[in-house]
């Protein structure tokens, strides 16, 4: 450990801005994090895609966090649904009943992620969407975006955020319908087709 004399603030070097961390790996993995929907719920959808860097390469070590309202547009106010072993504290899984609206998914070796959640209802004047937060190497700060689902063109056209974007940029926020309740949403961190990211306050 390096000791630094902090009695003279002008002699203290700032922490390098290119260093992110410290990371506590044991706290990040969230087994079953993509299983957000209660088991057997009729409004369950699957949202899946890839996370790509600026060169178009898939990122095998990114984290995607999702949260969203229930099908009636209500933001869940329930406690977490994770079950832990009372003796060891180990992860047992979600309880399969409560819908918290939140999940954390790690991308696989091909940069792929997927989540089973409930189709979100509309919040106010917004078209239905899921919020997403991306953590990945090379990012000093995590990125926020939205995942809108296609199908209700009138709601998408009236959405205040989407209405401010040109068609090409708008398309980076709308998932592709793959049929049978499955949607694809690729996240591009930079470059051509870069996903629109939002400032969250």
Language-model segments: which ranges?
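Beta-strand-dominated extracellular/periplasmic modules and repeats
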Residues: 1-201
């Amino acid at each position: 450990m390096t000791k630094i004399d902090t009695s003279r603030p002008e002699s203290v070097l700032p922490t390098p801005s290119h260093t992110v961390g410290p990371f506590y790996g044991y706290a990040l993995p969230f087994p079953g994090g993509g299983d957000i929907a209660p088991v057997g719920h009729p409004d369950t959808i699957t949202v899946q895609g890839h996370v790509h860097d600026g060169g178009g390469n898939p990122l095998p070590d990114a984290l995607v966090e999702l949260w969203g309202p229930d099908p009636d547009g209500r933001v869940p106010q329930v406690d977490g649904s994770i079950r832990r072993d009372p003796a060891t504290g180990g992860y047992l899984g979600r309880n399969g009943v409560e819908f918290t609206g939140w999940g954390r998914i790690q991308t696989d070796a091909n940069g792929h992620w997927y989540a089973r959640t409930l189709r979100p209802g509309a919040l106010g004047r917004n078209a239905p969407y899921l919020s997403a937060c991306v953590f990945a190497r090379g990012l000093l700060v995590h990125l926020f975006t939205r995942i809108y689902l296609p199908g209700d063109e009138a709601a998408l056209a009236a959405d205040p955020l989407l209405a401010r974007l040109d068609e090409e940029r708008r398309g980076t926020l709308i998932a592709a319908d793959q049929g049978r309740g499955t949607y694809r949403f690729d996240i591009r961190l930079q470059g051509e087709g870069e996903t629109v990211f939002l400032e969250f306050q």
